[in-house]
Amino acid sequence: MTTLTKKQINWLDKCASGIWTLNPKTGLVDVKGTFDCSDRGLKGFKGVKFGVVTGDFWCNYNLITSLEGAPQEVGGSFYCDGNSLTSLEGAPQKVGGDFNCAYNSLTSLEGAPQKVGVDFKCSYNQLTSLVGSPREVGRNFRCDENRLISLVGAPQEVGRGFDCEYNRLTSLEGATLNVRLELFRSCGNPVSGKTLVAIFEKMCGGHSFVIAAASLRNEMSKTSWKFIAPHIPDAIQPGVSMLGRFGLFN
């Protein structure tokens, strides 16, 4: 696209807080400033394809089903929450601030940026896996209110907090281990939040999920153990549980 229609130009003028320009070589629209097209009943970006937006990009609370045409890079935050997205394909790959894709119908995080400067929020979706998550999140990672059964695919680094409340977690395999312990949120899962935090603390101390969970068998409820037991090999359950009584894994 080397030219824009009058409707596209009017739309860009209304939504851009700053200067927008069309690169005739790439056909991409760059914005020096913020772009806000939130809450306008949009199903897409009117055929416009964005390149770099130096400020924030708001397209939340619309009816958008695809991020095709979304910015390739956002210097500030990117908000696409409250839409009808089932995929993050087309999402910006560089985001300096927050990335919020909550309240959609996502079943996968494939296509998400691999580095997010501040917070990443994918709450209130239909995720069963975290595969595709950013590798690095500067502050908080929120994946609460989904359908996760484990944390496989979670970021390798999270600067502050990790919220996985109200999922279907029976395992912490894949958990990000460099977050602040007091900001690891895990209530509302089949395994009690207290038990998950205790397991997570041992994992942060260098133990695998299997060893950490098995060592706490005598300290958790029968209900929690019922969900965790299938993850623990039968051969190691008695020995690890006994050694746990003597504080070997403290």
Spans of features found by a protein language model:
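Serine/proline-rich low-complexity intrinsically disordered segments, especially terminal tails, linkers
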Residues: 68, 79-80, 86-89, 101, ...
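LRR N-terminal entry segment and analogous cap-like coil->beta motifs
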Residues: 14-80, 95-97, 101, 117-118, ...
